[in-house]
């Protein structure tokens, strides 16, 4: 199953009780993904600081250039849409099979593999940004790159077994001219 939502609060992913409980036990179950990650000055391993900065559109490129993405509002303050959360969930029966004593450990690997393949397809085929053409009109151009994080959880909010992966797609992409802009 797949559900989607806007990322509206960084702390939801980092501080929620059930997220924190699962993350303490499963430190290797989170990672950055997407081809844009290679152009950014971040550790390939997941960490809270890089996750927070990517959500807020505060990016340092591998060349050391600092970029702050967003649009200025009427008060002159920068506003940035953090991105999207795509949540890939295994069926309940599969989650139970995986999490029971002596459960099949291949299930989590299969969930990660399927999620990564789907995310790669989305990145290649559905990643766009806006650009002004010579006449000043705004048009969409395909970029084929983004940055994301994969956060595995085995519990839902009710602390029931529910294997799922949150794919947070950050609101940033690299245009063909090399500039990093919002999706």
Descriptions of predicted regions:
Residues 1-163, 168-183:
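Intrinsically disordered, flexible peripheral segments
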């Amino acid at each position: 199953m797949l559900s989607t939502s806007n990322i509206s609060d960084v702390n939801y992913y980092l501080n929620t009780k059930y997220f924190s409980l699962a993350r303490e036990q499963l430190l290797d179950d989170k990672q950055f993904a997407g081809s844009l990650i290679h152009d950014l000055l971040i550790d390939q391993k997941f960490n809270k600081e890089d996750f927070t900065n990517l959500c807020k559109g505060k990016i340092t490129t591998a060349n050391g250039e600092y970029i702050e993405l967003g649009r200025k509002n009427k008060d002159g303050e920068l506003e940035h849409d953090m991105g999207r959360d795509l949540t890939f969930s295994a069926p309940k029966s599969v989650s139970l099979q995986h999490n029971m004593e002596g459960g099949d450990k291949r299930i989590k690997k299969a969930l990660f593999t399927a999620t990564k393949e789907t995310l790669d397809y989305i990145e290649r085929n559905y990643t766009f940004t806006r650009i002004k053409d010579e006449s000043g009109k705004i048009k969409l151009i395909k970029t084929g790159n983004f940055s994301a994080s994969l956060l595995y959880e085995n519990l839902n909010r009710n602390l029931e077994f529910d294997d799922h992966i949150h794919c947070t797609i950050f609101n940033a992409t690299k245009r063909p001219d090399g500039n990093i802009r919002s999706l």
